[in-house]
Curated annotation (Swiss-Prot):
Organism: Anemone leveillei
Cellular compartments annotated: Membrane
Gene Ontology CC terms: endoplasmic reticulum membrane
Family per record: Belongs to the fatty acid desaturase type 1 family.
Name of the protein described by the UniProt record: Acyl-CoA C20 Delta5-desaturase
Residue positions of motif Histidine box-2: 127-131
Motif (Histidine box-1): 90-95
UniProt domain comment: The histidine box domains are involved in binding the catalytic metal ions.
Pathway in which this enzyme or protein is active: Lipid metabolism; polyunsaturated fatty acid biosynthesis
């Protein structure tokens, strides 16, 4: 019996006992306890110091506020978060829902690197494992292991994640390209470069607003998709997992909160399937198509929609 089958059996057995709050899918929540007293590897130490340090820097936001710093924060969030993480890392690199000229693919991927959520290889690999093992005990950030585990604590136990999922075996399409191998090896140096440039052009206020506030905002909005959108919302599609559509999270994340749509049609470049579901990232992709830059754009067919509908 393979690991996927075992995980599904565990989830099915647990499902007979309890439900997550406000969810239509029954499952027993088994909180994953982070072992704080242990031998920490360098990855986990970096994660907790980096994320913790950024949160501490955010405490200086009121005293360092200026409109110039605010607009730097806003611009970098829009560019790195929307074009980088959402459009590039997620919809382009992970799911291959559309194609870009290689130079533009590489540029957007580098922009995504500066959202500071990890290098493209790590991000793509982790998210592909999430879709392969969605909401089972093999999911890297499974909601059945507790809200705070799937929101943030999973980042502090890389050994546990590797033991569950493996490393980059599912991201071979990126690892065979020297550009992505380079970004994977040198990620931390790009973090230092970003900090140095922000300090050079705006001093400590730019570090606080352009790096800390902007990055922490992006972190928690992305993490809310993992935690909230696998717990609260509506489920128009029969995905067999806990994914939900949450309009509030969708508004905050440029369309990523239409998460049940995404799990039903993960290959789709469009997450806001209905006309009224605002999906800013989709509008950008359509603009790129109009400019002749985005091609082979994938969206769900009416046949596939009928197949995935609860009304089927």
């Amino acid at each position: 019996m393979d690991l996927t089958s075992m995980a599904m059996q565990e989830t099915t057995a647990a499902a007979e006992e309890d439900r997550l709050p406000c969810s239509e899918v029954p499952v027993k929540e088994k909180t994953k306890k982070i072992t704080w007293v242990r031998k920490w590897n360098s990855t986990d130490v970096f994660h907790i110091l980096f994320i913790g340090g950024l949160h501490v820097l955010c405490l200086f936001a009121p005293s360092t506020f200026s409109w110039k710093s605010f607009w730097v924060c806003f611009a970098l969030y829009a560019i790195c978060g929307v074009f980088g993480t959402t459009l590039s890392f997620h919809r382009n690199l992970t799911h291959r829902s559309f194609k870009l000229p290689k130079y533009l693919e590489y540029f957007f991927a580098y922009v995504g690197l500066h959202a500071l959520q990890g290098d493209p290889v790590w991000w793509v690999s982790t998210h592909r494992y999430h879709h392969k093992y969605t909401d089972t005990y093999l999911d890297p950030h499974s909601p059945i292991e507790g809200f705070w585990f799937c929101h943030i604590f999973w980042l502090f136990d890389s050994k546990y994640i590797i033991e569950k999922c493996g490393r980059y075996e599912n991201a071979g399409d990126l690892m065979k390209q020297s550009y992505y191998r380079f970004l994977e090896r040198t990620f931390v140096y790009h973090v230092y470069l970003q900090a140095a440039l922000l300090y050079l052009f705006g001093g400590f206020p730019f570090i606080v607003w352009g790096m800390a506030v902007r990055t922490i905002l992006g972190f928690h909005l992305s993490w809310l998709v993992n935690s909230v959108c696998h717990r609260w919302g509506n489920r128009p599609w029969n995905t067999g997992d806990l994914s939900t559509n949450n309009w509030f999270i969708a508004m905050l994340t440029s369309g990523e909160g239409w998460h049940n749509n995404h799990h039903a049609f993960e290959y789709s470049a469009r997450h806001g399937i209905e006309w009224w579901q605002i999906d800013t990232t989709w509008y950008i992709i359509k603009l790129l198509e109009y400019l002749g830059l985005a091609t082979d754009i994938k969206v769900p067919s009416e046949i596939h929609k009928r197949k995935m509908s609860f009304k089927n």
